[in-house]
A protein has these predicted regions:
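Walker A/P-loop
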Residues: 247-286
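Short glycine-rich substrate-engagement loop in P-loop NTPases that contacts/grips substrate
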Residues: 302-323
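Peripheral, non-AAA+ core regions of ATP-driven protein-machinery
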Residues: 16-246, 253-256, 500-501, 518-540
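The Walker A (P-loop) glycine that initiates the GxxxxGKT/S ATP-binding motif of P-loop NTPases
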Residues: 249, 313, 335
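Walker B catalytic acidic pair
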Residues: 328, 334-335
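Single conserved hydrophobic/aromatic residue that forms the stacking wall/gate
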Residues: 1-15, 137
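Basic, amphipathic alpha-helical bundle interface domains used for macromolecular binding and assembly
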Residues: 66-74, 89, 96-106, 318, ...
Length: 540
């Protein structure tokens, strides 16, 4: 009560100062504006929050092409201002967020609206909020909650020449990634006003940089998997060239374990990749408790009943979906035949274009979809084919089951590998002699192949063998006479599509890099073709 009385005393003092100002100055004070940001896809645009306080029937009106959650700020802002110790005169308040042709959504406009109202009423000097972007959601008690999309907003502020950003404390680690912008964290409306008036902020958050990592590295290793040496080599090749791969095998053969360990052999992300991934997760509101720069490559494994908008992105106010959240990492579809046909067929275009375009309310949103697709499935409905002692599925049943994945989608997998059931002797042999490929040795082989690709594609806009165009293949996948005869014979015998032919050559190029070969050999082509046995690998 004492604290509230002091606050009200300050209010009355401010009111008296306000009333003593000449009428011309008072008219100026009744209008104020501050800067904020709105998300548009993965980017942000700077917007201006304008407030006019005038005579008339007391009301609070808002305009500027606003979503429902922005309109709901009326009551949040009014109550938060009162509970922070500030009193507003019973006048007509009009809020406009411009430009009006951009849809405004999210709760990050609460704080800028409140500060603009306080500025218009003389509680703060508008000059002090010049060159500052303001973001934050208000609670009824005046505290400030975190919001999504702070990173792209601060990045856009930097591009626009804005030097300061007033953001929630919980978004501090995220905001400070951007250099040359003074990040001001605040946890209450009162603290924000204190900073604007006095340039002082209390309890500025200074987290340990190690806490900024938003994903927890699990101690998983390919050494945990006994046997499956062929599948491990195929996985290593797939990661080296960012090739899409499918695991087919009975339940318990290690398909899921194999896939979940892929991040352990992927090279660490560059800073630019980390920034791109962090930007995506910021927009999606999935940066976690500490926020900050995402250090680990994404591994997304959506359940098979995922909705179309959650998978591809979209909704009334578009947000990134699973295929975008998996960017620079792995999208793992376990039990792939259980996914809805519209999900599987919808993958075809993003796999080719590496992005997805969504149209909502007359605007076009383009999200990246630069991921490595990893699938896992059983060879038949019961899962035990070709073990006829346990499998009673007919060949027609098997074909029908495999047919849940269309041939155009099959064609987009560079590699397919069987994971056979592991017997007791294999488990004991592997555990006794310790001669099991582990993640560290596999990662070193991947790094050597990646280095070869880095030199090969230096100065080009591609990084991996899987990204080569037809022209790039003619340049980097030249074949000798024997190799040409072999690929020609395979093409004719198996009636390959043009895409299938290019997939074999790209995979062969990666195998050559893994083995340290300058040129593609017949052995490389034969191995690449072995991985393209789709779907014959399951029924022969």
């Amino acid at each position: 009560d004492v604290e509230r009385s002091r606050g009200l005393g300050d209010v009355y003092k401010r009111q008296n100062i306000y009333l003593s100002i000449d009428s011309e100055r008072r008219r100026y004070l009744l209008y104020s504006s501050v800067l904020s940001g709105v998300l548009y896809g993965l980017k942000a645009e700077i917007v201006r929050v304008e407030v006019d306080v005038g005579n008339g029937i007391p009301s609070f009106e808002m305009s500027g092409f606003l979503s429902n959650e922005v309109k709901e700020a009326r009551e949040r802002v009014r109550v938060a201002i009162r509970n922070s110790g500030y009193e507003l005169p019973p006048q007509r308040i009009v809020v406009n967020i411009s430009p009006a042709d951009i849809r405004k959504c999210g709760t990050g406009f609460d704080l800028p609206i409140a500060l603009a109202i306080l500025s218009a009423n003389g509680y703060i000097d508008e000059v002090n909020v010049d060159n500052m972007i303001i973001l934050g959601e208000l609670s009824l008690d005046g505290s400030i909650n975190g919001v999504s999309g702070v990173l792209p907003c601060v990045c856009e502020a930097k591009k626009s020449g804005i030097s300061k950003a007033l953001i929630p404390v919980s978004n501090y680690n995220e905001g400070r990634i951007v250099e040359k912008v003074n990040i001001i964290p605040t946890n209450s409306l009162k603290m924000a006003v204190q900073y604007i008036n006095n340039g002082i902020i209390e309890n500025q958050r200074q987290d340990n940089p190690e806490q900024c990592r938003t994903t927890d590295k699990q101690e998983i290793n390919y050494a945990d998997i006994c046997g499956q040496e062929a599948a491990k080599r195929a996985t290593m090749i797939a990661v080296a060239g960012m090739h899409n791969i499918m695991y087919i095998g009975p339940p318990g053969s290690g398909k899921t374990m194999m896939a979940k360990r892929i991040p352990s052999i992927m090279p660490d992300m560059t800073f630019d990749e980390k920034l791109a991934v962090t930007n995506i997760y910021s927009v999606a509101g999935q940066l976690g408790e500490y926020g900050g720069l995402v250090e680990d490559r994404p591994f997304r494994a959506p359940y098979h009943n995922v909705t179309k908008s959650s998978f591809f992105g979209g909704g009334m106010f578009p947000r990134p979906g699973e295929i975008t959240l998996a960017g620079k990492g792995v999208l793992f579809l376990d039990e792939m035949t259980e996914f809805k046909p519209e999900i599987l067929e919808g993958l075809r275009q993003p796999l080719e274009d590496k992005d997805i375009t969504i149209v909502r309310m007359g605007r076009t949103y383009t999200y990246p979809a630069d991921f490595m697709l990893v699938g896992a499935m059983n060879p038949c409905k019961c899962g035990y084919y070709p073990d006829r002692s346990r499998c009673n599925c007919s060949e027609q049943d098997i074909k029908r089951y495999i047919g849940k994945i269309s041939m155009p989608l099959w064609d987009r997998f560079d590699m397919c590998i069987k994971t056979d059931e592991i017997g007791y002797e294999q488990i004991r042999c592997s555990s006794d002699n310790g001669n099991v490929p582990d993640s560290e040795s596999m990662k070193q082989a991947v790094m050597r192949a990646r280095f070869a690709q880095l030199k090969r594609f230096n100065g080009m806009n591609i990084k991996y063998n899987s990204q080569m165009s037809t022209g790039d293949m003619k340049r980097f996948c030249r074949l000798g006479e024997e190799e040409e005869k072999l690929i020609k014979r395979i093409f004719a015998k198996k009636r390959l599509t043009a895409r299938g032919y290019s997939k074999i050559l790209k995979t062969a190029r990666t195998i050559a890099d893994i083995d340290g070969n300058v040129n593609i050999t017949t052995a490389n082509i034969s191995e690449a073709f072995y991985y393209r046995g789709i779907p014959e690998v399951t029924i022969h």
